[in-house]
């Protein structure tokens, strides 16, 4: 517990409790989002905003601009200064008390935070953007286990671009995150010459069109594109200098990344390389050799996929209970897929689209269900089954739901069932990485199309990625037309090209039917020869049915509906 954080919480509740737009908070001396939200709402009330919000939005920013910079030389409301001082304590800085007076202690605390944010101008003045940076949980000091190099880039970006209208201070904690990635895209847009009204932090068509190609020997002179490209490499885990020089060492790391992401290994910073560094789809127009689909693969569709260059197809083991969507592998479909020369990999998903689905017990159930279905379809041992996390899981969801779920899957699949099948995960990048690093998944199938997911934005490709789902397309035409998800394949898992022939539970019965029909067909041929044109096939079918009902469905009562039983054929069949 921090005494000054507690004092801040007590002051907030004492001052604003009962006022419309303020929500009282627990007084526990612990910094957290609820305290930051309370400080934000208190500021909004002091600025005359009646429709308060937890969000530090455009109205709050506009009102602060109207108020002007806050410093030792300005006369601000006492309560606004207390909000600044309380926020400083929550951030770990000491302003010298919750006094309501913007004195030297407050100025020095703000200046220290500005230094940590990377600003060359550490004047201790609270501008609207500095105030916004105060009222969140971002850290401006290096966190345990984080990268000093990443932090230095975060600071560099803050200092270089904070004067642009929509560029807000990012954390300087040494962690590559959603905010850092978005700030990097803003910086690219500014270097491309986009105005403040157009730059939006999204890697959209205009940004893509203007992205430059960078080559060995080039340096940053008139712009900072090489710095930004180096930053993208560093954020993705490639240790290159951050010096604005496209050196041989940079080229070498670029080729390593291109190899990992299955791009052409040119060593050049081309569009596809930029895209793969910045967004989870990379270039969505890339053509993969793998795909997945909810639609049955017929022979015509298989031919369409092959003509389009696909070699591997993912299909679902089961349908979702209560759903009318029939997405599972159909009888005979695997034989059709494999006969066409395609490989196949299995996906298990019944629902998996929200947090409350995931827990350890459900993981155990899913393991049993996936195992049963895979065995019934004939998938051989060591086939990878991909279990789906089909939503933007982050924060507490991971520790409280997703990890226990995959622990349950492992307990059954690798314990009780004896490691028959390998466990894969279908999920956003970060979820795949966290689950895999805990040893709970062998391979990752990345839901890369969801570029805005928290688990994709600001996270590199998982080290064990097998498939990367980047676009939905339609291939073929007529009876061969099929909609698929287009997947890039790393080669870690190429699916399977053979399955076990699964014996039917009714094999003995079907064998008996085969013998009966063969006998009936011979008898029917004789009848056809004797009776000029009796339809042999129809008669053979009727004779088989007669034999099967001979013991229980006989006698004069059955004659009007089922007809007479041919006694000669019956004796013939019994002998055989």
From Swiss-Prot:
InterPro entries: Glycoside_hydrolase_SF (IPR017853), Peptidoglycan-bd-like (IPR002477), PGBD-like_sf (IPR036365), PGBDSf (IPR036366), Rv2525c-like_Glyco_Hydro-like (IPR015020). Pfam families: PG_binding_1, Rv2525c_GlyHyd-like. Signal peptide: none annotated. Induction: Repressed by FadR in the absence of LCFAs (fatty acids of 14-20 carbon atoms). When LCFAs are present in the medium, they are converted to long-chain acyl-CoAs, which antagonize FadR as to its binding to fadR boxes on target DNA and thus derepress transcription. Belongs to the FadG family. This is Uncharacterized protein FadG.
């Amino acid at each position: 517990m921090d005494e000054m954080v507690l004092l801040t919480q007590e002051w907030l509740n004492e001052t604003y409790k009962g006022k419309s737009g303020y929500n009282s908070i627990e007084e526990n001396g612990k910094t957290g989002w609820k305290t930051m939200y309370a400080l934000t709402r208190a500021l909004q009330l002091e600025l005359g905003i009646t429709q308060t919000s937890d969000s530090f939005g455009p109205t709050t920013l506009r009102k602060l601009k109207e108020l002007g910079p806050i410093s030792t030389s300005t006369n601000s409301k006492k309560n606004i200064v207390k909000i600044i001082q309380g926020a400083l304590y929550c951030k770990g800085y000491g302003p010298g008390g919750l006094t309501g007076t913007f004195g030297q202690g407050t100025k020095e605390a703000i200046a220290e935070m500005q230094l940590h944010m990377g600003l060359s101008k550490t004047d201790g003045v609270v501008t609207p953007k500095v105030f916004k940076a105060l009222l969140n949980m971002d850290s401006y000091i290096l966190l345990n286990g984080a990268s000093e190099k990443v932090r230095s880039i975060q600071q560099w970006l803050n200092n270089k671009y904070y004067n642009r209208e929509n560029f807000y201070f990012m954390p300087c904690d040494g962690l590559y995150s959603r905010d850092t990635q978005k700030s990097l895209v803003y910086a690219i847009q500014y270097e491309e010459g986009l105005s403040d009204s157009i730059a939006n932090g999204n890697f959209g068509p205009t940004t893509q069109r203007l992205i430059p190609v960078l080559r060995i020997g080039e340096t940053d002179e008139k712009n900072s594109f090489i710095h930004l490209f180096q930053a993208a490499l560093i954020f993705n885990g490639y240790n290159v200098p951050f010096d604005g020089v496209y050196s041989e060492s940079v080229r070498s790391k670029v080729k390593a990344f291109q190899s990992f992401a299955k791009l052409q290994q040119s060593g050049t910073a081309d569009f596809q390389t930029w895209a793969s560094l910045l967004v989870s789809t990379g270039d969505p127009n890339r053509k993969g050799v793998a795909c997945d689909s909810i639609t049955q693969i017929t022979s015509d569709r298989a031919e369409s996929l092959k003509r389009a260059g696909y070699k591997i197809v993912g299909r679902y083991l089961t349908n979702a209970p209560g759903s009318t969507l029939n997405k599972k592998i159909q009888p005979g479909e695997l034989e059709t897929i494999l006969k066409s020369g395609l490989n196949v990999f299995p996906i298990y998903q019944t629902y998996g689209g929200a947090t409350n689905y995931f827990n350890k017990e459900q993981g155990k159930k899913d393991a049993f269900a996936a195992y049963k279905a895979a065995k019934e379809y004939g998938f051989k041992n060591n086939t990878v089954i991909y279990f789906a996390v089909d939503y933007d899981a982050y924060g507490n969801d991971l520790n409280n739901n997703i990890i226990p779920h995959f622990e349950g899957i492992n307990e059954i699949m690798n314990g009780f069932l004896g490691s028959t099948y390998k466990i894969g995960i279908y999920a956003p990048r970060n979820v795949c990485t966290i689950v895999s690093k805990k040893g709970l998944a062998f391979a990752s199938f990345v839901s890369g199309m969801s570029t805005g997911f928290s688990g994709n934005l600001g996270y590199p490709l998982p080290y064990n990625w097998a498939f990367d789902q980047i676009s939905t397309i339609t291939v073929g035409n007529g009876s061969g037309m099929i909609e698929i998800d287009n997947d890039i394949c790393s080669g870690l898992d190429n699916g399977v090209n053979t399955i076990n022939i699964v014996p039917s539970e009714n094999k003995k019965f079907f064998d008996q039917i085969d013998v009966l029909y063969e006998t009936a067909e011979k008898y029917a041929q004789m009848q056809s020869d004797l009776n000029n044109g009796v339809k042999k096939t129809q008669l053979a079918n009727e004779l088989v049915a007669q034999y099967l009902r001979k013991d229980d469905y006989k006698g004069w009562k059955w004659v009007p509906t089922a007809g007479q039983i041919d006694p000669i054929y019956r004796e013939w069949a019994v002998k055989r």
